[in-house]
From Swiss-Prot:
Active site residues according to the UniProt entry: 3, 39
Glycosylation: residue positions: 251
Record bears the keyword Protein biosynthesis: no
Family under the similarity heading: Belongs to the arthropod phospholipase D family. Class II subfamily.
Record keywords, A-Z: Cytolysis, Dermonecrotic toxin, Disulfide bond, Glycoprotein, Hemolysis, Lipid degradation, Lipid metabolism, Lyase, Magnesium, Metal-binding, Secreted, Toxin
Cofactor(s) listed in the protein's UniProt record: Mg(2+)
UniProt GO MF annotations: lyase activity; metal ion binding; phosphoric diester hydrolase activity; toxin activity
Iron as UniProt keyword: no
Source organism of the structure: Loxosceles arizonica
Record protein name field: Dermonecrotic toxin LarSicTox-alphaIB2bii
Catalytic activity from the UniProt record: an N-(acyl)-sphingosylphosphocholine = an N-(acyl)-sphingosyl-1,3-cyclic phosphate + choline; an N-(acyl)-sphingosylphosphoethanolamine = an N-(acyl)-sphingosyl-1,3-cyclic phosphate + ethanolamine; a 1-acyl-sn-glycero-3-phosphocholine = a 1-acyl-sn-glycero-2,3-cyclic phosphate + choline; a 1-acyl-sn-glycero-3-phosphoethanolamine = a 1-acyl-sn-glycero-2,3-cyclic phosphate + ethanolamine
InterPro entries: PLC-like_Pdiesterase_TIM-brl
Taxonomic lineage from the root: Eukaryota, Metazoa, Ecdysozoa, Arthropoda, Chelicerata
Protein EC: 4.6.1.-
Cofactor annotation comment: Binds 1 Mg(2+) ion per subunit.
Length: 274
């Protein structure tokens, strides 16, 4: 999963390095409109934090990259995580943010349901109090006549809240599936300081008979040793600034029989247990 892909040209760059998924930051204006694909300072070490596009222009480029037959099409690119930088919004704006996000995706990415981009989408929300963003997104697609597109959409609460608190937020939002759970820390902090305890709890929830999690991914992993540690606990995805590092580890004898990069034929909402 290629991290912080916010300029159009970076789509090609990260896929060519081996990524089958990208993560893109989405900032909002004061009226809860998605405005830019932009991270800003601070960000991961050894990355330029200020690359950006207008959100709708990025969606159009992403659509071309994920539409079979287009000259810019990448068959390998099957999943996009939108990291929704909604920290500037009030809690009571979350529904509107979801509504406006859905309308933008419907028009500029899904092409109003007419041969739009085919990638699966994960809406990654940092604040549990913004669970109504999910509600606004779902209800808008239904109102606009395209409820079937929700089959392409999953969810992630990306804060470091307890697993139980996250489960409660999903309950409030009426979410019963298609859940990706993230865990991690910036690459500027040594991974051993943070540790894998919360990621292990997420994997345990995924593997339990009554868990809410379908997939677990870990970020931001740039080192070979940390990649192996994450794979050893059974995560489903790894977010990285260096997709070639992940690809190289997956080709090692200890991992190539158990793991592979997902393709479009794989179901990103299906649970695989340890």
């Amino acid at each position: 999963m290629g991290h912080m892909v916010n300029a159009n040209y970076q789509i090609d760059e990260f896929v060519n390095l081996g990524a089958n998924s990208i993560e893109t930051d989405v900032s909002f204006d004061s009226s809860a409109n998605p405005e830019y694909t932009y991270h800003g300072v601070p960000c991961d070490c050894r990355r330029w934090c200020k690359k950006w596009e207008y959100f709708n222009n990025f969606l159009k480029a992403l659509r071309k990259a994920t539409t079979p037959g287009d000259s810019k099409y990448h068959e390998k690119l099957v999943l996009v995580v939108f990291d929704l930088k909604a920290g500037s919004l009030y809690d009571n704006q979350a529904y509107d943010a979801g509504k406006k996000l859905a309308k933008n995706l419907l028009q500029h990415y899904w092409n109003n349901g007419n041969n739009g981009g085919r990638a699966y989408i994960v809406l990654s929300i940092p604040n549990l109090a913004h669970y109504k963003l999910i509600t606004g997104f779902k209800e808008t697609l239904k109102t606009e006549g395209h409820p079937e597109l929700m089959e392409k959409v999953g969810y992630d609460f990306s804060g470091n809240d307890s697993i139980d608190q996250v489960a409660n937020a999903y309950k409030k939002a009426g979410v019963t599936g298609r859940v990706w759970q993230s865990d991690g820390i910036t690459n500027c902090v040594a991974s051993f300081i943070r540790g894998l305890d919360r990621a292990k709890k997420a994997v345990k929830n995924r593997d339990s008979s009554n868990g809410y999690i379908n997939k677990v991914y870990y970020w931001t992993v740039d080192k070979y040793a940390t990649t192996r540690e994450a794979l050893d606990i059974g995560v489903d995805g790894i977010m990285t600034n260096y997709p070639d590092v992940i690809a190289n580890v997956l080709n090692e004898s200890a991992y190539k029989e158990k793991f592979r990069l997902a393709t479009y034929d794989d179901n990103p909402w299906e649970t695989f247990k340890n």
